[in-house]
Curated annotation (Swiss-Prot):
Name this protein carries in UniProt: Large ribosomal subunit protein bL19
InterPro entries recorded: Ribosomal_bL19, Ribosomal_bL19_CS, Ribosomal_bL19_sf, Translation_prot_SH3-like_sf
Gene Ontology MF term list: structural constituent of ribosome
Organism: Chlorobium luteolum (strain DSM 273 / BCRC 81028 / 2530)
Record-level GO cellular component terms: cytosolic large ribosomal subunit
Length: 120
């Protein structure tokens, strides 16, 4: 059974995706099809959870839109993802940041920033 799963995952086209960790602020460009038109829609928020591995990996991204919390579960290997950009690297001490759901206002998106050294 494991060999079958590995075989299927090997044939999946992988999207170039940076390392995403809980606490990171990301902007994801998604392809949205409305009728016959296709456009890009940006979803920017904090990664509060990641789940799974390989082709079935998903992340949960949360943002505040007009005072209302919006969460979206996004499969990392989805063909509808155009690009993923990490805006800030957050320093989280938990693997799931569900406690951000209880916070309101700016505190709902506040995660300490992590310094990342970029090597050329």
């Amino acid at each position: 059974m494991d060999q079958l799963i590995q075989l299927v995952e090997a044939t999946q086209p992988g999207v170039e995706c940076p390392a995403l960790n809980p606490g990171d602020t990301v902007r994801i460009q998604l392809r949205v099809i409305e009728g016959e038109k296709e456009r890009l829609q940006a979803f920017e928020g904090v990664v509060i959870s990641d789940r799974g591995a390989g082709a079935s990996k998903t992340i949960t991204v949360r943002k505040i839109s007009h005072g209302v919390g919006v969460e979206r579960i996004i499969p990392v290997n989805s063909p509808n993802i155009e690009s993923v950009t990490v805006l800030k690297h957050g320093k989280a001490r938990r693997s799931k940041l569900f406690y951000l759901r209880k916070r309101t206002g700016k505190a709902a998106l506040k995660v300490k920033e992590r310094k990342v050294s970029e090597q050329a």
